[in-house]
Swiss-Prot record:
One of its GO terms (biological process) is regulation of cytokine production. Disulfide bonds: none annotated. CDD domains: BTB_POZ_ZBTB26_Bioref (cd18214). A zinc finger (C2H2-type) spans 273-295, 298-320, 326-348, 354-377. PROSITE patterns: BTB (PS50097), ZINC_FINGER_C2H2_1 (PS00028), ZINC_FINGER_C2H2_2 (PS50157). Residues 201-216 have a biased composition (Polar residues). PANTHER family: AGAP004733-PA (PTHR46105), ZINC FINGER AND BTB DOMAIN CONTAINING 12 (PTHR46105:SF29). This is Zinc finger and BTB domain-containing protein 26. May be involved in transcriptional regulation. Ubiquitous. One of its GO terms (cellular component) is nucleoplasm.
Amino acid sequence: MSERSDLLHFKFENYGDSMLQKMNKLREENKFCDVTVLIDDIEVQGHKIVFAAGSPFLRDQFLLNDSREVKISILQSSEVGRQLLLSCYSGVLEFPEMELVNYLTAASFLQMSHIVERCTQALWKFIKPKQPMDSKEGCEPQSASPQSKEQQGDARGSPKQDSPCIHPSEDSMDMEDSDIQIVKVESIGDVSEVRSKKDQNQFISSEPTALHSSEPQHSLINSTVENRVSEIEQNHLHNYALSYTGSDNIIMASKDVFGPNIRGVDKGLQWHHQCPKCTRVFRHLENYANHLKMHKLFMCLLCGKTFTQKGNLHRHMRVHAGIKPFQCKICGKTFSQKCSLQDHLNLHSGDKPHKCNYCDMVFAHKPVLRKHLKQLHGKNSFDNANERNVQDLTVDFDSFACTTVTDSKGCQPQPDATQVLDAGKLAQAVLNLRNDSTCVN
């Protein structure tokens, strides 16, 4: 017997960094460069494999366009895009603080998630957690006297009493020349907490979530969200009217703002955001977004739509940002999703790959097929796919019929027993499949 030889295992420390340095040197010497990325008026030469690994957006562009030049256009300066591409080689990105939002937006366009994550973390340091008693300095105390409480009960949630207090943060005061302006919005719930502590017993007995969480919410925030989150909070709080109902001191949400679909919880307390996975309800958008992370849901902070996958949220954010990275080479029309581009190409090629399995009509666009199924047949795409599977499994039972050719003696041969049994089982299976496919829950 041969003795078992021992395996030698070598692990080279910092091997990846050294390889990137060598590839960057080759790029600087313009050796083995197989692509040129044109960012408006700036050319960036490099290697497809490096750019594709660092930017999923460029990876898709390389797959769609097998040429040595790729043109992209970003809203920010061309130098911002150039620095982002060079960081794929060096792993280092350095820029002034006032350019943070520009780099965050450009990195989101290029789908460089590692840079988006770090920029989001850096952006959070400008948002300072509010102090518990800051509202006393800038806002009039509403609970100073019993008379103010009586006026509050008569006012029924007047805008003057319920309007939020806005204080510029210290960082924004120091950065007057910067493009970044951070404001800290104190919610109406905090002001009402200063007015009366008795109302706290009527709130839901759940663990409170901080309004300004120190944990980065990069999984829920895309490039355009950070720029508008303060504006959304302010508009949301201005429209959120609270009122007291007599001596019971029950806080009610204004139905004129949120409509009749608001659900009440705990003695008339009504909220705005309800978790689709559990019974928790939230008044503040930030708390609701933090809670959704527990269910592995990702929410758009602009429209409130939730997604089960982070990539779907990123594709959804392109619609809000107006980003359309997929362009038709024939007519130049751009699209926000690759599937929309592929559907559009059917117009140029004349292909109609989408077929209705109920009437054999074909369509170039899938949305047209869905509309056809709903209006004419009362079906959906899932039913249409099941109908196709049933048709594929439909068997010509005549092929299982025994041949009746007469032999030389004038006798007809009898069919094989196993052949008849198999045909019977197959016929029953097809009938069962048809019954299952037409079952409606």
